[in-house]
A protein has these predicted regions:
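Surface-exposed, low-hydrophobicity beta-strand/loop segments enriched in small/polar/acidic residues
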Residues: 1-139
């Protein structure tokens, strides 16, 4: 699930073609494949090798029009506050930096001697553990 809580009138929602056979649901995070179609992001997000990433707003599983047209709608910018139930099994704190891992929100990590910092895609606004919802803003 992905909701636009504020900024809906200014949100930049774009429609892109998805790779045949790929099922994308609201709240999944996608990247472009080598042929220019969208696929679900996998592994630790790497901006250099995977390029830009977007959250899916309108899917191709239950949204018949999108499935028939071969497209999904993603939020690309100016979205205000977004809310999702698709995130890693961790506790979120408002203000903390977010990244993407295996197609869902996760906490960003700082650089260490042996690893680089994870790319920051946004920040936590609110976390409701009881409802299993994270509100966030894109970077």
């Amino acid at each position: 699930m992905l909701n636009v809580l504020s900024g809906y009138t200014t949100a930049n929602i774009k429609s892109y073609e998805f790779k045949a056979g790929v099922q994308l649901e609201p709240g999944d995070w996608v990247v472009f494949d080598t042929d220019g179609t969208l696929i679900k992001q996998t592994g630790a997000y790497d901006m250099v090798t995977q390029g830009v990433t977007f959250p899916v707003y309108q899917n191709n599983v239950t949204a018949y029009d999108n499935r028939v047209l071969g497209r999904v709608d993603v939020v690309t910018a100016n979205s205000g506050v977004l809310e999702t139930d698709k995130f890693a099994a961790v506790s979120f704190t408002p203000g903390k930096a977010l990244t993407i891992k295996d197609g869902v929100l996760a906490l960003a990590t700082a650089a260490t001697e042996s690893t680089a910092a994870s790319p920051v895609i946004g920040f936590v606004v609110k976390y409701d553990a009881a409802k299993k919802l994270v509100q966030f803003v894109l970077n």
